[in-house]
Amino acid sequence: MTIDILAYGEAMVEFNQRADDARMYLQGFGGDTSNFCIAAARQGARTGYISALGNDHFGQQLRNLWQAEQVDATHVLHDQQAASGVYFVSHDKDGHHFDYLRAGSAASRYTSAQLPLQAIADAKLLHLSGISLAISASACDAGLAAMAHARKHGVRTSLDTNLRLKLWPLERAREKMREAFALCDICLPSWDDVSILTGLDDRDAIVDALQAYGVGLIAFKLGAEGCYVATREERRLVPAYTVDALDATGAGDCFGGAFIARLVAGDDPFAAARYANVCAALSTTGYGAVAPIPLAAQVEKILDSK
């Protein structure tokens, strides 16, 4: 199978607190780039994943998930000496909160020497996130090497900022994300992330800064406000689609997967953003990062009715 979109990062097993019983957690799956792949696959893109898992039951569950979701896991390695990552989602009046058990995980031990260079060169697009780079020094080196290799072979690259300061200090995050921006064709930042990374507090100034690194297309995720799409020629706010949200876990990943899937399918950036806004909104109407991600038919039904 020819892969449209390859993503590199860490997949994890999720335990999401139930709203009706705080003592109970529902098991699911997460990891931002894995969520991205599944969202893109549910919109019809052919996706593949680059990572490593522990030789454990959780790792096998993730492989089973990708098989069911038609995400190619050929390039997900087994690490006999490490575990697969786990995280917990809790909910309160201030929203959702994350706690991670990922130190020393299989994905964090990934190195540049393990990259599937031919698969990257053969893909249409390579996707990473700030978390892909933050989980360890070796994983960061591998991610940047993957982006450079993709660029060398004419493969487009996309980057979701996904800043997690629990994983790395701000100065290192800024240094390495600047390197990533310089290798990035399409950036999917959120306000909180990119305002911290750039030190800027104006939307257009942030877009100017990203474009100065060479980023050609920016889809600025603004939550309930929608998405601010910027090309070299045009900048436009694409309004959000409003729903009664239950859990926003993974909504940004869903947006990214849907947006990139539609770009690869040939949509212009503004049409792709309209589609992705609906897709991400629908993903917040259930609990967990993966289970509520809608299929293309559900999104298209809403778009056709507007």
Protein language model regions, located:
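Conserved N-terminal subdomain of the carbohydrate kinase-like
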Residues: R46-G130, K301-K306
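Conserved beta-alpha-beta core of the PfkB/ribokinase-like small-molecule kinase fold
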Residues: L125, I131-D208, E225-G226
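Structural alpha-helical scaffold elements that stabilize or flank donor/cofactor-binding regions
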Residues: Q118-A119, E179-A180, Q211
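Glycine-rich phosphate/adenosyl-contacting loop at the front of the ribokinase-like
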Residues: M1-D72, L246
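Anion (oxyanion) recognition and catalysis
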Residues: A41, Q67, A148-K152, Q211
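Active-site metal-binding loops of divalent metal-dependent hydrolases
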Residues: G9-A11, I131, T161, C254
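Conserved phosphate-binding/catalytic region of the ribokinase-like
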Residues: M1-L6, A148-H149, G199-K306
